[in-house]
Amino acid sequence: MRNKKVELLAPAGNAEAFYGAVHAGADAIYLGGNRFGARAYAENFSEDELVDCIRYAHLLGRKVYLTVNTLVKESEFSELYEYLMPYYRAGLDGVIIQDMGVFAFIRDAFPQMELHGSTQMTITGEYGAEFLQKQGACRVVPARELSLEAVSYTHLTLPTNSRV
């Protein structure tokens, strides 16, 4: 039987939205830092702000997920490692990822980190979702183009430890 507990996951584009989501009852908050996020021109969080958010959320039993949802060039992987390390040390709960190479890199470099497949990975069905789960993803955010019926079908076909 599937776990029926729902995680209320809220976005936060700035500190005010983060604290608002935490105090409104979100179980988890996802946000972008100042690098490797699709919202490059958004306000986003500085390194210190993000570390403070992680620590604050954990004091209240909440989780924080960081978006790393851009394509990363081969020459940028050492920068990605340095970028993620302070958040990993602070206890970042997971990373929402677009690029399969980034997915494999983070899986290997940060083995305790939860990996989530971003909607930008364009997973459209059970084969893609199952493949990603076998690679270590604990959550798959399906492609935006899918109908609710297609998402429900994919959810029902996956192993019980997967989340869609």
Which positions does each model-derived feature cover?
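Alpha-helix-loop-beta-strand connector modules within alpha/beta enzyme cores
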Residues: E47-Y65, I106-Q112, L156
